Amino acid sequence: MRSLTRRDFLKSGILASSLSCIPQSVMAASRLPLFIPPLLEAKRGRPIFLTMQAAQTSFIEKKLTEVWGFNGHHLGPTVRVEQGDFVKLNYRNNLTQAVAMNIQGLQAHSELIGGIGRVLKAGEGWAPILPITQPASTCFYHACTLANSAYQTYRGLVGMWIINDKDTHQSKLPKKYGVDDIPLILQDVLLNSKGEQVFQNQPHFLGERLLVNGVEAPYLNVPKGLVRLRLLNASLSRSYDLTFDDERAFFLIAREQGYLPQTKIVKKVSLAPSERVELLVDLSEGGNVTLITGSKRNLLNKIGTIFSSDMLVDNVIVELRTEGVKSVFYNPSHWQFHTDAPSLLAKKNMKTREFYFDVSNATINQQRFEPNRIDISTKRGQIERWILSSSRPVGFKIQGARFVMKSINDQPVEQSDIAWKDSLWIDGKVEILVQFNHASSTKFPFIFGSSDLVLADQGCLGSIVVQ
């Protein structure tokens, strides 16, 4: 937290006087609607075109500013595919700098996912055909250019990638995209007086404003009934604690790579960089409710954000406003889902590896990333036990593989919370069981390491070859 100056005191007094005159209802009424990214589906062999290019948007006070994104929009469209599809993907780089792309969570051969070895220079394209073999999951695509992934993702090179399967279609889960199945991409940003993104070259990046699908503190009109929220933490360094402002319980149904064994009733869910969760909230009784990060704020809390260098100006993620008549309500309290994730806990005699993340020096086991060095060699079908620890809390992710969390600080993870994952938050020590189902090569290795992209760009990464 920065030191307090006389100017800060004067500033806080003016703000307090101003805010005290504004009713909460008026502040809520000034919200902008949530932007729903366009939906691209690979139906009947239709190619998916993703063109990286500059675009224009307005973050504050209708001030247009240049951003990056895909197909003419800030951020990317939501790509939705089906298990069993062969997806024709067509990237095109219309930016002025080279970009490498990754589909985080996609389970496929390394030469098809993209990654740091697949760099598209300005004006270049790439068109892989992706076999979709994994069950239902929420993945995302983003820039992973070596030493430049944080800046490029921050500017807008990120989008959601949804995989559906037969079980999804047969379930009673909400599945109308943008209506009761809502994508929410979280990014914190710094903006200057012109409304332009500011990127500071610091060890970690913590912005002052929280954007959701590119909009600050938005609202969304939703039908009465169950609403499904798919949340992606696309922030560079910041983690979030998701809760509702009225402290209501909601249902956690899935993490990055698939469903939990059954719905879990919770009041708070944490989200590290690169993590995704799927939530269900019961809005069958109507009314409005707001999803926030952290605690509900009063006037003094809002004034206090002036003095903090790492607090968000507004901690609202989205306000859900119900409309229409009450729909048929299915109580999801005891819904069960098909998943083989818990079976991994019974495996024995696995190779054990330990990784220590020195956050201050951006190293893993005292080494920074070296493109010509292979850090891990393993085989397809192998299951390994990894023990992760860090000098300070930090996000972790792995490409091309999946894992289950076995223990956190030597305490077993509850059976009800076991799901396939590819990202997590290290706060102390975490034990995971990693499954390698797909091959990679020395030219296109899988990458693991910090999901804090600022740290990753400094070298907090490692490479994996799976034969």
UniProtKB/Swiss-Prot annotation:
Does the keyword section mention Cytoplasm? no
**Intracellular or extracellular location(s):** Periplasm
Record note on modification: Predicted to be exported by the Tat system. The position of the signal peptide cleavage has not been experimentally proven.
Signal sequence, start to end: 1-28
Per the record, its GO cellular-component terms are: cell division site; outer membrane-bounded periplasmic space
Q: Which domain of life is it from?
A: Bacteria
Keyword annotations of the record = Cell cycle, Cell division, Periplasm, Signal
UniProt GO molecular function: copper ion binding
> Principal place where this protein is found?
periplasm
Checking InterPro entries in the record gives:
Cu-oxidase-like_N, Cu-oxidase_fam, Cupredoxin, FtsP
Q: Which GO terms describe its biological process?
A: FtsZ-dependent cytokinesis
Q: What family is reported?
A: Belongs to the FtsP family.
Tell me, what does this protein do in biology?
Cell division protein that is required for growth during stress conditions. May be involved in protecting or stabilizing the divisomal assembly under conditions of stress.
Name recorded for this polypeptide: Cell division protein FtsP
Q: Which organism is it from?
A: Histophilus somni (strain 2336) (Haemophilus somnus)
